[in-house]
Amino acid sequence: MISPKETFIYYQELLEYISKKLDYDLQLIQRKTYGEINELLRKGEIDLAFICSGPYAARKELYGFEALAVPVIRGKPFYQSYLIVNKKSPYNKLEDLRGRVFAFTDPESNTGALVPKYWLALIKETPDSFFHEITYSYSHNNSILAVAKNLVDAASVDGHIWEFYNRNNPTYTEETHVIKKSIPFGSPPLVVSRYLSEKLKVNISTLIQTMHTDPQGIRILNKLMIDRFVPPEEEWYQPIKKMYQYLSFTGK
């Protein structure tokens, strides 16, 4: 699965598919930060969104998220965080990055912020104590580009997005090297606002979970590197909750 910021046209096709099948007008809205999208959902100003697994696991009650479906990619409804460095760099493990420049994606990102902070906490460090400088790229492809061009020494990114570019446009991923991968987490879910009608929630859920049986749906899914959508399981997001709890307990 790839994020809307990187693939506007493919997600536009997905929304048009839902709109046509359900006779319900949908428009694609993008914002710079995850927090902005989450707040729009909380206020009921948008109906549905693909959101990061981090905010879903930790703050779904606050924002009123209700997960309808999760993408299955390469046969699994999971994704990982990849710690990447430039392929010509001498860095082979997290500890080698002490005193270097690191790029997070978004402050609320699971793979692009929470995971590397958790890794550092395990060695009794924080981003400020460990890195010389940190920056926020606000998208995974920006982080990949920054590492490839040596604008930063390392970054933590969504493994699905790295794999998408490595397969379809490896210009920059081939300049990077993955030195660490996280455990699997539940993939970013499709969620709806608490204000959406129950009937529409059911209709959207049914449609998106069966689109892999429709030729047009298959074409759209293939472009997004999604096999199909399945119902979410809360246990897939428990490891994320545990990371939040660990960071809160340790003060890291």
Tell me what each language-model feature is.
Residues R100-K199:
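Pocket-lining segment of extracytoplasmic ligand-binding domains
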Residues G35-A49, L62-Y63, E95, H140-H160:
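Short helices/loops that flank or line small-molecule/ion binding pockets
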Residues R31, E39-D96:
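Acidic, polar ligand-binding/catalytic clefts
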Residues M1-S19, R31, P77-I144, R219:
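Bilobed "Venus flytrap"/periplasmic-binding protein-like clamshell domains
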Residues S3-E13, F185-S187, V191-K252:
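An extracytoplasmic/periplasmic, membrane-proximal ligand-sensing/linker region
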Residues M1-A57:
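Extracytoplasmic small-molecule ligand-binding "clamshell" domains
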Residues S19-D23, R42, I46, A121, ...:
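Sec-exported extracytoplasmic/periplasmic mature domains
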Residues Y10, L14, T33, I37, ...:
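Stable alpha-helical elements in mature extracytoplasmic
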